[in-house]
Amino acid sequence: MSRRADGRADDELREVRITRGFTTHPAGSVLVEFGQTRVMCTASVTEGVPAWRRDSGLGWLTAEYAMLPAATHTRSGRESVKGRVGGRTQEISRLVGRSLRACIDLAAIGENTIAIDCDVLQADGGTRTAAITGAYVALADAVTWLGAAGALADPQPISCAIAAVSVGVVDGRVRLDLPYEEDSRAEVDMNVVATDTGTLVEIQGTGEGATFPRSTLDKLLDAALAGCEQLFAVQKEALALPYPGVLPEPAEPAKRK
């Protein structure tokens, strides 16, 4: 099997690292690294839900994604300064939210909101898939925090793990976890979000330079699901460690007058 520019085999992930407790204030805070791509993922818990969700007994999970101005070789202006959020940013924010809502029972968290924030510190391809993979771990820590606070109706509201990875056809070969150098010239580019139960959450795929046959799609999915299995193992190893911060005390029941 031929080696890629970074020395990896076609079916090999970049080195993946997940660091919990990266910052101290959110209920969940993770630094996820896929090679040179680095994303900070936080999960903050707030009491209450959006107006359209009130009195439903259901919680909510929302997500925002953004890139720091110097995350790439050429500095980009902050979208907050521009006064509008770009289409790519909105698309990825919604993707992260959809992906994580697929694994959590929102009825179990009561009328609370979990806000996921994914900030790309350094980009070298695969930022959205790294964001989803790291945000799942931050979400798991936020659920632990809610459990300690006595806010869960179900002690285990997360039904499965969620991970995501990019795959593509580069130089005529199916390759896993594309860095920018490969992503920018891929003939086929695809992002796959999957669960550890073997099901798919979302597939985003495009023939960038040409069409591709069903057989190539099958090979891309096989490579992506094999990559996700490795990511689930990294997530599991990270979450095997104790909660990295200070957990809240359960709220005391109100005293009768």
UniProtKB/Swiss-Prot annotation:
Nucleotidyltransferase listed as a keyword: yes
One BP annotation, GO: rRNA processing
Top EC class of this enzyme: transferase
Assigned keywords, A-Z: Nucleotidyltransferase, RNA-binding, rRNA processing, Transferase, tRNA processing, tRNA-binding
Database matches in SUPFAM superfamilies: Ribonuclease PH domain 2-like, Ribosomal protein S5 domain 2-like
E.C. numbers: 2.7.7.56
Molecular functions (GO terms): 3'-5'-RNA exonuclease activity; tRNA binding; tRNA nucleotidyltransferase activity
Catalysis performed (reactions): tRNA(n+1) + phosphate = tRNA(n) + a ribonucleoside 5'-diphosphate
InterPro entries listed in its UniProt record: ExoRNase_PH_dom1 (IPR001247), ExoRNase_PH_dom2 (IPR015847), ExoRNase_PH_dom2_sf (IPR036345), PNPase/RNase_PH_dom_sf (IPR027408), Ribosomal_Su5_D2-typ_SF (IPR020568), RNase_PH (IPR050080), RNase_PH_bac-type (IPR002381), RNase_PH_CS (IPR018336)
Residues reported to bind phosphate: R88, G126, T127, R128
Gene3D superfamilies, A to Z: GHMP Kinase, N-terminal domain
PROSITE patterns: RIBONUCLEASE_PH (PS01277)
Pfam families: RNase_PH, RNase_PH_C
Entry's family note: Belongs to the RNase PH family.
Role, per record: Phosphorolytic 3'-5' exoribonuclease that plays an important role in tRNA 3'-end maturation. Removes nucleotide residues following the 3'-CCA terminus of tRNAs; can also add nucleotides to the ends of RNA molecules by using nucleoside diphosphates as substrates, but this may not be physiologically important. Probably plays a role in initiation of 16S rRNA degradation (leading to ribosome degradation) during starvation.
Subunit organization: Homohexameric ring arranged as a trimer of dimers.
Protein name, entry field: Ribonuclease PH
Gene designation per UniProt: rph
